[in-house]
């Protein structure tokens, strides 16, 4: 998560945004590579193995955050015990996944950016008009094409890659890139998204992760520590824990000071 990665991501954002903004037909040409005009469908979406691979990709991505989520739940139950996972790891993984694959994707753009999916546009024998990535005035009402939630989730694996040991980090970043690209390619092959939907999803995820990593691990003014996070969670969950112990006839004092 260095400045080189940031500059590459911003450069790609600029190039892809301008190129596909000026020549939106490129999105249609890339989508057409997966379309069978004779069958009037995107045939790969009916392939059982491809469908399983799509589901498995999401299971793999979510598996990276399960330990952090479980550790947070256990901390809520037993705030008197130390966190089982590093505090910064929990905050970093949960915050980046929530923002990139949740808030920015499904709760914001996909709900209000009315771009129809490839499978329903006129060029692929659907009823709706194609619109370029930058135009929110499409006829899609909900769960729209821009930008891809599954693409954002797949590329979110940059977050656990950023926490890999330094000697393994380049390989982890490469694996996250391949994983995100393969998952995004499947979404395109199913007619679920255009190239710009998945590419921008990946870039948004990367930028969210880069900023969160800098705030949590690097910048002195915002940098957190595992101990501070553990102490803050103890204070947060202590009142409920104390009330539960009182119901069991056990009197305990206030939360331990940091």
Where are these regions (language model features)?
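Structural signal for the C-terminal ends of transmembrane alpha-helices
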Residues: 22-23, 70-82, 162-168, 211-217
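N-terminal transmembrane-helix/juxtamembrane module of multi-pass inner/ER membrane proteins
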Residues: 2-69, 110-113, 117, 127, ...
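Transmembrane alpha-helix boundary/anchor motif
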Residues: 21, 25-29, 103-108, 190, ...
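Membrane interface segments of multi-pass transport proteins and intramembrane proteases
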Residues: 36-43, 47, 69-85, 220-227
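Interfacial segments of alpha-helical transmembrane regions
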Residues: 74-112, 173
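Membrane-interface interhelical connector segments
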Residues: 112-139
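Membrane-embedded catalytic cores of phosphoryl/pyrophosphoryl-handling enzymes
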Residues: 2-13, 130-255
